């Protein structure tokens, strides 16, 4: 219960800061989208790290919870990566004049999104734990 209260307090503080701060002198009010975009991008990378550590735990120690953690982190990471891609393009349109620029960072986040989708497809396709371990090794 105290963790839920702390989460609600942080959410309220973030909402207050997002709506009460002034716009940037160059970006105007479009800078406010960074309050959503940056945490989503960080969480997408964090889910990828959790999946990598879980894959190591599955391959080395063959712990069943590592396999569950690996399988559970993929949809969460895909959702946050999609949020980061959408909010990034919403920010990029007024700043760059286009929705998408083939920058290395943008392209790597898009490839990360495709990797998440591929891993989700592997997990949906193979239901036995042994075959999922093979997909982790790939």
Name what the model sees in each region.
Residues 1-23, 28-29, 34-96, 101-138:
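Hydrophobic cores of alpha-helical transmembrane segments in multi-pass integral membrane proteins
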């Amino acid at each position: 219960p105290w963790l839920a209260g702390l989460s609600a307090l942080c959410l309220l503080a973030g909402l207050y800061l997002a709506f009460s701060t002034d716009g940037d002198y160059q970006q105007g009010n479009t800078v406010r989208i960074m309050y959503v975009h940056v945490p989503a991008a960080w969480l997408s990378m964090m889910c990828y790290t959790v999946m990598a550590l879980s894959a190591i735990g599955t391959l080395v120690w063959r712990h069943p919870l590592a396999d569950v953690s690996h399988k559970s982190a993929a949809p969460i990471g895909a959702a946050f990566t999609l949020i980061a891609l959408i909010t990034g393009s919403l920010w990029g349109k007024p700043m760059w004049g286009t929705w998408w620029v083939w920058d290395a960072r943008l392209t790597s986040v898009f490839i990360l999104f495709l990797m998440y989708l591929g891993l989700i497809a592997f997990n949906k396709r193979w239901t036995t734990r042994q075959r999922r371990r093979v997909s982790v090794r790939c």
